[in-house]
């Protein structure tokens, strides 16, 4: 059985694969990872205001509570990803400004016990893989790459 997730869901997919041996493959779409550099400053604002507001150009603002940051900052993501012992694919858009493309390589670099850890960067893809652009070319590529990965690893 495979596990996958997008953005924060990608972060959860990594943690799930690290902590549950039932999964035989893991895949992330713009998977969030260890963002402690940003999170400390945002946490301070959340503590002061009751939340930190994250803005996007594709959805309404997201208000993150201090508890979100406390949880996120308490996890050693590299150590967790190092527990993954199954194939891992980190897909990211080259034009993603929410979870920058370099994040995918950080995930793969931490996956030291995975027998097959790969990065796939998609040209022209933003954080939503261009689903709001009216052109589904990137999305079709993403879906096919996902299908191909799970066919190969499940």
Where on the chain are the PLM-derived regions?
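Active-site loop->helix "elbow" adjoining a glycine-rich segment at hydrolase catalytic centers
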Residues: 7-10
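Active-site nucleophile elbow and catalytic-triad environment of alpha/beta-hydrolase enzymes
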Residues: 63-80
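Catalytic histidine neighborhood in serine/cysteine hydrolases
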Residues: 111-128
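Alpha/beta-hydrolase fold nucleophile elbow
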Residues: 1-5
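Hydrolase active-site cap/lid region
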Residues: 15-64
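Short beta-strand/loop motif that positions the catalytic acidic residue
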Residues: 84, 90-92, 96
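Catalytic histidine-centered segment of alpha/beta-hydrolase-like enzymes
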Residues: 125-139
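Short alpha-helix in the alpha/beta-hydrolase fold that links the catalytic acid
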Residues: 86, 100-110
